[in-house]
């Protein structure tokens, strides 16, 4: 919906960006089950630059608790191993030729609680990002109303719409967090 020079769909898009970033961050949290998304945040020093692991290797899940990383270029194996170790995912690479195998250890109760805390931190960062977008939208509405580009009634109605979008997005963040928390705590 667009009124004057205010487009609420742009705010929705920016808020959805925060939830997509949260999904990406939560996907990188280890839950005790192998998932190729665990390695998405891993950056490899390759050819003089930082590259995502998925640009230098193929990641597969041959078993529920095993990741297999097929490195395309033999000269990159050591760099990929180092990137995995440096990523603080708690994984120990075992190399056989051009294949790096990563056993996913069982999570103990203490580690599960730590991961839940990290997930909560990610979710709070997403909520803060959503609130910043809301504040930007409300500030824009106030400026438009002050400059007489929209009426006071329109400003209040649109502010209410912005709040509804904010509430829905924060609810989505909370649902993503609850699902990840359940996944982490399930033994």
Swiss-Prot record:
Keyword Cytoplasm listed? The answer is yes
A Pfam family matched by this chain, by name?
A: RRF
One GO biological process term is: cytoplasmic translational termination
Q: What is its main location?
A: cytoplasm
Instruction: Identify the keywords attached in UniProt to this record, alphabetized.
Output: Cytoplasm, Protein biosynthesis
Question: Which sequence ranges are marked TM in the entry?
Answer: none
Q: Which GO terms describe its cellular component?
A: cytosol
GO terms for MF: ribosomal large subunit binding
Paired cysteines (S-S): none
Domain of life, per lineage: Bacteria
| UniProt subcellular location | Cytoplasm
Function description? Responsible for the release of ribosomes from messenger RNA at the termination of protein biosynthesis. May increase the efficiency of translation by recycling ribosomes from one round of translation to another.
Similarity comment: family membership: Belongs to the RRF family.
- Name assigned to this protein: Ribosome-recycling factor
Q: What is the lineage of its organism?
A: Bacteria, Pseudomonadati, Pseudomonadota, Alphaproteobacteria, Hyphomicrobiales
